[in-house]
Amino acid sequence: MTDFEKIHSFESLYNAYRKARQGKRWKGAAAKFEVNLLEALNLLSAQIRTKRYTMSPYNTFEVYEPKRRVVMSNSYKDKVVQHSLCDNVLEPILTRSFIRDNYASQVGKGTHYGLDRLQEFMRRFYRKNGIDGWILKGDISKYFYSIRHDVLKTLIREKITDPDVLWLIDLIIDSTEGNVGIPIGNQTSQLFALLYLDGLDHFVKEKLGIKYYGRYMDDFFLIHHDKAYLQECRKQIEAFVQARGLSLNAKTNIFPLKHGVDFLGFHTYLTESGAVIRKVRRRSKNNMKRKLKKLAALHAAGRIDAKTVEQSYQSWRGHAEKGNSYHLIQRTDQYYNRLMKSKEAAQCQKH
């Protein structure tokens, strides 16, 4: 079976449909798709096989946490196709060259894995060099919106040669206006974005010789004992990303290890004794309190149930538990309980 056949086979599309329907916000769309499921999947398979498949218009909306972003969400049928493409071709082929410390959107990795690796690197550095070290914290400005279609297609063609698969990939890449930018909401965009800076990962590790390096999508760090060398690394990284149409965010800077670094929602720093401390960032705390207030108000108005509020809070709580956050969690638990009790009391008074 060719890679293209793996994508459009009925079995692959059925498995992709089952994965796509797991997201809560897709329940309504999944129900419509299921009305004539066999017919819908057979039609989709035939459309891809004969290259008559076209993508539906995007649903565009804005999200504001952790920062303002424009999200372009695709239709349910397009989501099914992208699941099949990613699971059967893109993920197994593109990730082969990824370094261990490329943390995002991969099975067995993620934010907590990235945080653990940063902590491990700091400990290793301390054992060899003590506390006198530096960390270059980098960030790509408007990453997804700046990815050039022509560069991305070239990088993909270094890995994938099947012309039929490339037809489908190009269709997805070119589904937005212009020749720059990929939709944040697409599943394929996650793998495309990981691939786009795979070359940077190898450049930093192999050419610049940085032992302690990690990247989570557009966020990366380098640890070294020599500040001057990290300044040189920054110049070379800047030149590398500029060649791909990208630029470093103004926040990119070099900090003493003992002052720590903001990475993946935590502030992580090294103490004089060699202990690595991980604290929830102030912005994350404030965002959670604001979100809880909004959710509690929606609950009091009868628009959502208490379970929805609790699930959101428990998700943040699980994240906070990955750091040195015992007292913070105790305080936030008390805040959450006060908030929910006051809203429940208000509801009782209404009735």
What are these regions (language model features)?
Residues 1-152, 160:
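Conserved two-metal-ion catalytic palm core of "right-hand" nucleic acid polymerases
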Residues 40, 47, 116-217, 221-238, ...:
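Conserved polymerase palm-domain catalytic core
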Residues 52-56, 210-217, 287-302:
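Short, conserved aromatic-histidine micro-motifs
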Residues 74-75, 79, 83, 175, ...:
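Right-hand nucleic-acid polymerase module
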Residues 85, 237, 241:
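PAPS/PAP-binding and catalytic site of the sulfotransferase fold
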Residues 95-96, 206-212, 245-248:
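Surface-exposed helix-capping loop/turn segments at secondary-structure junctions
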Residues 104-113, 221-224, 255-260:
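Beta-rich nucleic-acid/ligand-interaction surfaces
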